[in-house]
């Protein structure tokens, strides 16, 4: 087959502009306990499993043994924000709709947990066949397990799909799964790789033709 069969989307920072929600609630949580959490601290957590983020927050709050409780509270706050309003990244919804109209399959692979995606589900278009969250795997991103699971569910080889990712850990996971990756960096610069193209302008100026052409170039370079 010489046509793109599936798009595998990251969620936070790629499909949905939820990073301001995460960063805002992280800052509020730490401030409520007299600690400090800077933009740089928040950006370092982009793409990490929420458990790792929560442990860093707990330490900033001087509550290093309360990582699980902090994680539960952080997820609850962000889920409420997403449930109230889910802002798509510029160009993302249009790209998803164009892909659906062209019968290109789509799914979501995220480092967020099921509570976040449950809050988002009602606002997602029906184009997405399934969602894989951090709760569905033993080893979250940057481990390739989540992307390997997505490829098995799609029953497609990695070269017939394109992975959209914004973070260092997410793109590393996609590449480790053998995927062809299009990086759309938001807060973290991405390192070049033979199987990754980087759209520094994000998806705002990207249409389906550009994505398919890029996928084909990556595939042909294999």
Cite the ranges covered by each PLM segment.
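Conserved phosphate-coupling serine/threonine residues in phosphotransfer and NTP-handling enzymes
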Residues: 14, 110-112
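Asp-based, Mg2+/Mn2+-dependent phosphohydrolase catalytic module
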Residues: 1-5, 97-100, 104, 113-222
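N-terminal helical cap/lid subdomain that shapes the substrate entry/recognition surface
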Residues: 2-94, 101-102
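Glycine/proline-rich, flexible active-site/cofactor-binding loop segments
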Residues: 107
